């Protein structure tokens, strides 16, 4: 079974990949820093979830 993510996490991640897709990599730690740069997310949990979803989308582009 896969992970079910909340809609707002998917929306933020989709917009980030759409606008800054060439900047993100398959490295989760780098993506955490980039998510902090490009968004106003203050919470660590939400930031990590968005960064994880972005990492997954970059790693498996056919899932976008």
Curated annotation (Swiss-Prot):
NCBIfam families: PRK01151.1
UniProt entry keywords in alphabetical sequence: Ribonucleoprotein, Ribosomal protein
Protein name: Small ribosomal subunit protein eS17
Entry GO MF terms: structural constituent of ribosome
Protein family: Belongs to the eukaryotic ribosomal protein eS17 family.
Organism domain of life: Archaea
PANTHER family: 40S RIBOSOMAL PROTEIN S17
One Gene Ontology cellular component: ribosome
Taxonomic source organism: Methanococcoides burtonii (strain DSM 6242 / NBRC 107633 / OCM 468 / ACE-M)
UniProt record, GO biological process: translation
Classification via InterPro entries: Ribosomal_eS17 (IPR001210), Ribosomal_eS17_sf (IPR036401)
Pfam families attached to this UniProt entry: Ribosomal_S17e
Keyword Ribosomal protein assigned: yes
